[in-house]
């Protein structure tokens, strides 16, 4: 079964400042702030929610289809997806734009200053779910039977949710950092046409505030509500009960960037393969735990056999 992954493709440029921002910023002069930080180290990572989710689903042996927009600078990313054998045929290139990118500077106290340029992501609405449906109906691998709408351009997120619903494709609504772009009634409209909803605990609180509904009430509007809680695992609200998903202690904590996307890759694989929520949630939890031990969102490279072995070690049964 193929999964259509709607969301962002982005570059993350990460720089390290060998000092503390606080030593360079004078509070009494904040109104005329003009600072420059020398950053001796810099690296560029492949990122973006759609790219990260697809990467993790691919590790598990799933069949991700990415639907996203990139800029004229996307050649390295597209080459990488080709090497990984991830379906990138529905990634649209906007030549006059840059691929979305985050430029992150971290100081020695782990404070961060981030600049985000959405670039081509703002044109995500140009992509149409119907085009994927038409193409995959003729593809030997078969049609997309599951989807996810992850953070992307606002109009793209809105339209892709409605297009998936109209196509009869069950999907996860994963608003993430895009959640503040929607008001309460808009969020409820998207939730009501989604099959599943995935948020972290902070986003869950914001969702409750904006909609005026408790998470339990929100859960009544979807087949399942998944709330991730970082090192505390996750809760799955389903069939009027809450399934607690235990965390998988990480061997070491290196970088949390992309852990939520790794979790969602596990969710999609479990749903693709008809697993129960106890198993699906545990697999998703494990994927997040594996990711956090590596720098960057797409640098962990476990084999499917290694993932299976770690799952059995952690939970005492196989998926």
Predicted regions mapped to residue ranges:
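Glycine-rich phosphate/adenosyl-contacting loop at the front of the ribokinase-like
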Residues: 1-65, 76, 319
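Hydrophobic anchor at the start of a short beta-strand
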Residues: 3, 63-64, 88, 171, ...
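Cofactor-binding loop segments of dinucleotide-utilizing enzymes, especially the Rossmann-like FAD-
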Residues: 8, 68-72, 106-108, 117, ...
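Gly/Ala-rich phosphate-binding loop of Rossmann-like dinucleotide-binding domains
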Residues: 58, 165, 272
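A glycine-rich helix N-cap at a beta->alpha junction
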Residues: 82-97
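Conserved phosphate-binding/catalytic loop of the ribokinase/pfkB sugar-kinase fold
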Residues: 90-94, 102-151
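Conserved phosphate/ATP/ADP-binding segment of small-molecule kinases
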Residues: 159-245, 252
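Conserved phosphate-binding/catalytic region of the ribokinase-like
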Residues: 212-319
